[in-house]
Amino acid sequence: MSGKIIDKVKVFMGFDVFEDEEVEEEETVEIEDELVPVMNSKRNKVVNIHTTTQMKVVLYEPTNFEEAPNIVDNLKNRKPVIINLENIEPDLAKKFFDFLNGAIYALDGNIQKVSSGIFILAPNNVDISGNIKEELKNKGVFPWQK
């Protein structure tokens, strides 16, 4: 028993000799990566600004309300429409205007009054800038007219 107490005191004081324990070391292996040159395969993406498609403007002078869906179909196909409502009854003209104004709103388009019964209806891909009525009043319909 006395041997155990002495061993404990030696361990406590740090005088006890331990057998060297073998510590397993992890082997580090260096792997050389082969550098392979990568070819830059990016190609320049060139987009032609000038497109060959021409925008068509559709003119309508309706005589009855059955033509209204055809006008809206042109707007859905992203074609601007000029509509002349001067030669139809005022009630029918109001009905046309209300229907087309709702279609323009639904298609996120634009409507501009040219004269008392003539309107330009443009889909969302066509911008109408300025006040056309004022420009027509100042410049005339054709540039050479004043």
UniProtKB/Swiss-Prot annotation:
Entry's Gene Ontology cellular component terms: cytoplasm
UniProt KW Flavoprotein keyword: no
Keyword ATP-binding: no
GO biological process, one term: division septum assembly
Entry keyword set: Cell cycle, Cell division, Cytoplasm, Septation
Pfam families in the record: SepF (PF04472)
Top-rank taxon: Bacteria
Function in brief: Cell division protein that is part of the divisome complex and is recruited early to the Z-ring. Probably stimulates Z-ring formation, perhaps through the cross-linking of FtsZ protofilaments. Its function overlaps with FtsA.
HAMAP family per UniProt: SepF (MF_01197)
Subunit structure: Homodimer. Interacts with FtsZ.
Protein's name according to its UniProt entry: Cell division protein SepF
